[in-house]
Each structure stands twice: as structure tokens, then as C-alpha cells.
Regions:
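Intrinsically disordered, low-complexity acidic/Ser/Thr/Pro-rich linker and tail segments
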Residues: 1-123, 170-181, 222-238, 424-438
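A short beta-strand motif characteristic of beta-propeller blades
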Residues: 81-87, 123-130, 161-165, 175-183, ...
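Repeated scaffold domains used in trafficking and secretory/extracellular systems
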Residues: 88-97, 128-142, 173-193, 233-236, ...
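Structural signature of WD-repeat beta-propellers
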Residues: 99, 108-112, 146-149, 204-206, ...
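Conserved loop/turn motif of beta-propeller repeat scaffolds
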Residues: 101-102, 139-140, 197-198, 254-255, ...
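Hydrophobic beta-strand positions that form the internal "hydrophobic ladder"
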Residues: 104-105, 143, 201, 258, ...
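Structural motif
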Residues: 112-118, 149-155, 207-213, 264-269, ...
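Short loop/turn segments that connect beta-strands within beta-propeller blades
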Residues: 120-123, 156-158, 214-216, 271-275, ...
Length: 438
């Protein structure tokens, strides 16, 4: 019997498993899932040492681009073989952005972790000094750059500063005359979204959701009414929880609408003067995510229960005065995706692309028609898309960032139903001296 080299074993196992999964999905959709047996995961643990040695060799400075591509062909990317290593090395990546020059920004670590902001380009990975968190306005013009001193807003990445904003004190919007404590440290942003005029920033954090402006911060969540109710019930100020779970937010590209939510609220929509205009009951237990479509005339709202969820859509024209309850059957808030707990998402012409708890990127139309799915693995933690809608970047809790060329054809090793090909991935793993490109 001929002895195969490790890369041959890896390549054959990865491609065979991807094809088996894709066939399984195709059969299930065509014929139903009854009596279908899921493909067996191939044994690849014994190949990990050889894979790591080859990966390290492909990242040496003297390795040519041709050699790197040959490595990728011999050792095609896959999630399942890496599972034994993830408990030790995997970590969340809380934010990614595609810059106009094709480079990437990534914040390694989740919001509550110290983390590090890095810039990734074809030449390597470089720390971004003096920036601890970042965000970009929905019109793609302004960037918010945060550190312990406050938030700078710049016109373009590396462009001139147009605004400098202070972090909230933590006392904003709380009833006067009670001994509430200010923040000891600035909130750790879950999201930092400049408004399209560059003058204000939506700060979403586990310590509260605020709008930062030159004249101070305005608290949006938790709402003062909730605090007043707790005080009226006799709860001591120090016992009132001001923290949020599953906090999220979005700003429309024209700046007219602000969407916020958290585990204990409905989906809340405010106008540009921060007046409440809509309260939309979620399609599952806990509001979890919000996203506007590319045209800005539809809003996507996801809620979750455990690792599943339901996603509603609502026309922006229907927002003023809209009030619906949990699990409402209101025709103005149709269900457009059933099943996904959405952690990240982007929109392009006529299509939403969301990242779910099971490591899938799922695309569907504004009418809810399913388009395709693409498997990355772990849980998707952050996403961005290029202005032309042709390049997608997705990050996961496995410490992986992947760049995907949309509509470019699907390689044989890719699990998915869409014609999309990953062109590069990076592993930002705990315990490694440096990130490695795959």
C-alpha cells in the first residue's frame, strides 16, 4: 500500500468531507431530511503537527507568493480539523473593517477584553498604536477611533480629525438626587458608530447605550423610566442593574434613524433627534441584532433564543408610530429568516448576509428568499463588505479572519451552496508569537 504524504491525506480528507456535506445538504433540500445520515467527520488529528509546520514555513519572510499559494492548495482551509486546538488557541475577534485600499482592520479580543487593534495587508500585520476600538459610519466616510482619552472622529481612515468626543460619565439620564456611581473606566464598546455627519457617535456597550456629542452624552439604554420604576418599587440605587445584555445598535446611512435594543427591551427606533418613533416586538425571545439594507429603506431585526433565532424586516416608511408586541403577526414586520441567531451582518444590492452561531454565513433577499450559505466554522463574530459588494470579510470566535471573493466560484474544499471563494484567512491564536496567514 502506497504511503501518502500528510498534505495528500489532508487535502483528500478536506475535499471529500466538503463534497459529502454539500451533497447531504442538496439531498436534504430536494428530498427532505428523513432517513438522511450526516457525513462522518474524517480523522485528521494526526496531521495537525505537519499542517502547523507547513503553515509556519509558508509564513517565513523568504517564502514567495507562489509558494504560499502552493501551500494553500496542498493544505486547503477547513474548520473541522482545527477543532482539537481551539480550546487552547481560539479567541474572539470583535470587529473587522475593509478599508478602501484593500487592507483590513481587526480588533483581536472581545469588547470586555483588553484586545488589540491590527491592520492587515498583503505585506503583513501591523499594530495600530493609540487605538483601542474603532467603527465606521454607515455611509463609509467617517471613522470613530477610541482610547482611554475619548473618541476621535476622522474623515476617512487616517484623514483629518473632525470631532473629539468624551466618554459618558455613567450618570447621564439617571434620576437626579440619588447616589448613583459614575463609571470608573470608560465603557468597552460593543459598537462605535459615527453618524453620517461625523458630529455624533452611537456607543453601544454592556454598560449602557449612549449617543456621544460635543455637548455631552445622551443615554438611550437602559431608559430612565426603567430606573424610575425600580426606585418606585423600593429598590436601592446601588442594587439597580444598569448593565445590558445582547446590546446592539445601528444607524441608517442618511442618519435619520437610530435602532437600539438589548435582551430586556423591544426593538427601539429613534429619529435623528433621539425621539422614540417605533417599538417593534421581536420574533423570538431576546432582541439581538439590527441592520439596514443597502438602499436604507428596510430594517432587519433579529432576536434569539439559545443558539437559534428569528429575523423580521420592516419598511422604513412604516416605522413612524409602529408599535407591535412580541411574536406579532403584523404584516408590516414579516419573518424573513427563521433559525439564525445573528451575531454580525452586512447588506449589498438586494441581499442580506448574516453570520450565525453555528459558523455559517447565510444570504437571503429582502423578501426572505434564501440565496446561499457558506461555512466558516465556530461562531461568526464580525463582518464587513466592500463598497462594491464583491469582497466579504468575516471573523469568528475561533480567532480566524477570512477574506471571501463573492460570486467568484466555489473551490472544491468549500462547504456551502454559493459560488464564493475564500482567498485568504488569518489565524490570530492565543499562545502564538504572531498571527499566521493561510
Amino acid at each position: 500500500m502506497d504511503k501518502q504524504y500528510p498534505q495528500q491525506q489532508w487535502q483528500q480528507a478536506v475535499i471529500a468531507y466538503a463534497q459529502a456535506v454539500n451533497d447531504y445538504v442538496a439531498q436534504g433540500r430536494a428530498q427532505g431530511w428523513d432517513n438522511l445520515q450526516a457525513p462522518q467527520v474524517p480523522a485528521t488529528d494526526h496531521l495537525l503537527d505537519a499542517w502547523l509546520a507547513a503553515l509556519q514555513a509558508a509564513n517565513r519572510p523568504d517564502c514567495s507568493e507562489q509558494q504560499r499559494q502552493a501551500f494553500r492548495q496542498a493544505w486547503p482551509p477547513a474548520h473541522q480539523p482545527l477543532v482539537p486546538l481551539l480550546d487552547e488557541h481560539g479567541q474572539g475577534i470583535s470587529n473587522v473593517l475593509l478599508l478602501g485600499d484593500g487592507s483590513l482592520l481587526a480588533r483581536i479580543g472581545m469588547p470586555h477584553e483588553k484586545g488589540q487593534v491590527l491592520r492587515i495587508d498583503r505585506h503583513g500585520v501591523t499594530p495600530v498604536i493609540g487605538v483601542e476600538c474603532f467603527g465606521r459610519c454607515p455611509a463609509r466616510r467617517y471613522f470613530a477611533l477610541g482610547n482611554a482619552e475619548g473618541v476621535r472622529v476622522t474623515a476617512g481612515w487616517g484623514g483629518p480629525q473632525v470631532q473629539r468626543l468624551a466618554w459618558p460619565t455613567g450618570l447621564e439620564g439617571l434620576p437626579a438626587g440619588y447616589p448613583f456611581e459614575p463609571f470608573d473606566l470608560p465603557p468597552a464598546p460593543t459598537a462605535l458608530i459615527p453618524f453620517p455627519d461625523g458630529q455624533r457617535v452611537l456607543l453601544v456597550s454592556a454598560d449602557g447605550t449612549f449617543v456621544l456629542a460635543s455637548d455631552g452624552a445622551t443615554r438611550l439604554l437602559p431608559h430612565q423610566a426603567r430606573v424610575l420604576d425600580a426606585l418606585a418599587e423600593g429598590t436601592e440605587p446601588e442594587d439597580i442593574s444598569l448593565g445590558l445584555s445582547m446590546e446592539h445598535g445601528a444607524v441608517s446611512a442618511d442618519g435619520r434613524w437610530v435602532v437600539v435594543g438589548e435582551q430586556g427591551s423591544r426593538h427601539l427606533v429613534l429619529d435623528d433627534r433621539l425621539r422614540l418613533v417605533a417599538e417593534i416586538g421581536p420574533g423570538s425571545e431576546y432582541p439581538h441584532f439590527a441592520l439596514f439594507n443597502q438602499r436604507g429603506d428596510q430594517l432587519l431585526l433579529n432576536a434569539c433564543h439559545f443558539y437559534s433565532g428569528a429575523t423580521l424586516a420592516v419598511r422604513v416608511a412604516d416605522l413612524p408610530g409602529l408599535r407591535t408586541d412580541y411574536y406579532s403577526q403584523d404584516p408590516r414586520t414579516p419573518l424573513v429568516q427563521d433559525g439564525a441567531r445573528v451575531y454580525a451582518g452586512v447588506a449589498r444590492a438586494g441581499e442580506y448576509i448574516i453570520g450565525d452561531a453555528y459558523g455559517y454565513l447565510r444570504a437571503f433577499g429582502e423578501d426572505g428568499q434564501e440565496h446561499w450559505q457558506h461555512y466558516l466554522g465556530s461562531t461568526i463574530s464580525a463582518m464587513d463588505i466592500s463598497a462594491d459588494g464583491r469582497t466579504l470579510v468575516a471573523a469568528s470566535y475561533a480567532g480566524i479572519v477570512a477574506e471571501i471573493a463573492l460570486d467568484s466560484g466555489r473551490p472544491a474544499w468549500q462547504i456551502g451552496t454559493g459560488a464564493h471563494g475564500e482567498v485568504r484567512r488569518w489565524l490570530f491564536w492565543k499562545g502564538w508569537d504572531k498571527p499566521l496567514a493561510w
